């Protein structure tokens, strides 16, 4: 907890092509070494691939994938009387979004397709349909929280 004032959240500019703030955030998550133009090319390429493969609106598929990958609960370590307990806690909305984006990116990087835009397109389509690496990660986190439900009275 900061001892001084609370730092205000920065206003995120929506992306130029679709006018979506979430897409702009995702661009920043995908970006490596400050190369935003490369991240932009990857994401727009992936969205084009999504429209080709599914025939649906790419932004809708992206938003569905994002909402499907968001975790509801996660576990945090809490030390009580010399023992560490994994305590399930609810994830706040901003962290939900950040985790979902990170998991989508990581799952896309682990896929086998040739280029990153194809990998990302495949992962977003899979996540929108409720499968894929990001969904596996979310389910794993939910399972951990479910298994440690007995320690939920140690809330922070």
UniProtKB/Swiss-Prot annotation:
Keywords: Ribonucleoprotein, Ribosomal protein, RNA-binding, rRNA-binding, tRNA-binding. The lineage of its organism: Bacteria, Pseudomonadati, Pseudomonadota, Betaproteobacteria, Neisseriales. SUPFAM superfamilies: Ribosomal protein S7. PROSITE patterns: RIBOSOMAL_S7. It comes from Chromobacterium violaceum (strain ATCC 12472 / DSM 30191 / JCM 1249 / CCUG 213 / NBRC 12614 / NCIMB 9131 / NCTC 9757 / MK). NCBIfam families: rpsG_bact. The gene is rpsG. The keyword Protease does not apply. This is Small ribosomal subunit protein uS7. One of its GO terms (molecular function) is structural constituent of ribosome. One of its GO terms (biological process) is translation.
